[in-house]
Curated annotation (Swiss-Prot):
InterPro entries: HAD-like_hydrolase_sf (IPR050155), HAD-like_sf (IPR036412), HAD-SF_hydro_IA (IPR006439), HAD_2 (IPR041492), HAD_sf (IPR023214), PGP-like_dom2 (IPR023198), Pyrophosphatase_Ppax (IPR023733)
Annotated protein name in UniProt: Pyrophosphatase PpaX
Keyword ATP-binding: no
UniProt function note: Hydrolyzes pyrophosphate formed during P-Ser-HPr dephosphorylation by HPrK/P. Might play a role in controlling the intracellular pyrophosphate pool.
Active site: 11
Native source species: Listeria innocua serovar 6a (strain ATCC BAA-680 / CLIP 11262)
One Pfam family matching this protein: HAD_2
UniProt-listed Enzyme Commission number(s): 3.6.1.1
Keyword field contains Magnesium: yes
Catalysed conversion reaction: diphosphate + H2O = 2 phosphate + H(+)
Primary gene name: ppaX
Enzyme class: hydrolase
Cofactor: Mg(2+)
């Protein structure tokens, strides 16, 4: 493989695996526990998907942000395996990229152990050489630190890399790291929301990546 794009970095939640119901139910339980007098609809919760937990909880309830983070993680882990789903075609596309010797990595705002749990449940763990979680960086996306760390570990350059995600934090992180970027049309907030951040590509299905990287050769 001698193409321009050699390295593909992925967000996890909402990109590779469908954790939307898990995330929404976990937020609902956390908010009910700490803010029982306030009503949060699913639509209210959608903006919380993407930023780090502390960023979200400090904005909602700064006095109890750390307690909310702990409660969220405990609830999330308890219900994790029952509520995550695979997106159609993701496994096959990632396997094809792996078999064609592309360098594959994860850059997520989740903790490393939780990322690995999701990857193992869906059987994707064997395809990724590098996994960067929130506990491995000082600055979460959209800061480019995680992407730059992944590229260094993969011995890759920004010029040959693309960042793929379902949230503006992913697209902005890629732009800040000066890689190519791709949004996914199956993002819970919708492709129109993601398009306003001007990713270089918009994937209708994960297999679209195969055409993109082959076209760059």
């Amino acid at each position: 493989m001698t193409g321009k794009i050699t390295t593909l970095l992925f967000d996890l939640d909402g990109t590779l695996i469908n954790t939307n119901e898990l995330i929404i139910k976990t937020f609902q339980a956390t908010l009910q526990e700490f803010l029982p007098d306030r009503v949060f609809t699913r639509e209210d919760i959608l903006p919380f998907i993407g930023p780090s937990l502390m960023e979200t909880f400090r904005e909602i309830n700064p006095a109890h942000a750390e307690e909310m983070r702990v409660f969220y993680r405990e609830y999330n882990l308890k219900h994790h395996d029952d509520l995550i789903l695979e997106y159609d075609g993701v496994y096959e596309a990632i396997r094809a990229l792996y078999e064609e010797d592309y360098k594959l990595g994860i850059v997520s705002t989740k903790m490393y152990d939780t990322i690995m749990r999701g990857l193992k449940v869906t059987g994707l763990d064997k395809f990724f050489q590098v996994v960067i979680g929130l506990d491995q960086v000082s600055n979460a996306k959209p800061d480019p630190e995680g992407i730059e760390m992944a590229l260094s570990l993969l011995n890759a350059t920004k010029e040959e890399a693309i960042m793929i995600g379902d949230n503006y934090h992913d697209i902005e992180a890629g732009k800040n790291a000066e890689t190519l970027t791709a949004g996914v049309a199956w993002a819970i907030k919708g492709p129109e929301h993601l398009a306003q951040f001007q990713p270089d590509f918009m994937l209708e299905k994960m297999s679209d990546l195969l055409a993109i990287v082959r076209d760059e050769e």
